[in-house]
Amino acid sequence: MTGFSLGKLAIVKRGKHVGVPCVVVGKDSNGRWLVVDGNLMPVIRPKRKNPRHLRQTRLVLKEVAQRITEGKMLDNGWLRAQLLSASVTEELLFKEAEETAWRKMM
């Protein structure tokens, strides 16, 4: 359960939204993380997810985290744009790490 923080980019591992990138926007009293993606999981109705059902990434969306801590509202369209750019970055980082690991094996 450690490692998650506000603005952290995560990928859903279980449930009907498998594979969907989302952003952690909070935590409820039961230890579940509140995640949004601006589309299937809108800002006004964040999805409660068990931390075991989320795959952590290395990216933190600092603008999202800053807005949350300052108490500013998040906009679904803006959030989708942030997620899209972060998802592309994460995919590139993952491919780079995978290629590096492959080279080390050879």
Residue ranges and their predicted role:
Residues 1-6, 13, 23-106:
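Ferredoxin-like alpha/beta domains used as RNA- or RNAP-binding modules
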Residues 15-18:
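Short, charged beta-turn/beta-strand-edge "cap" motif at the junction between a beta-strand
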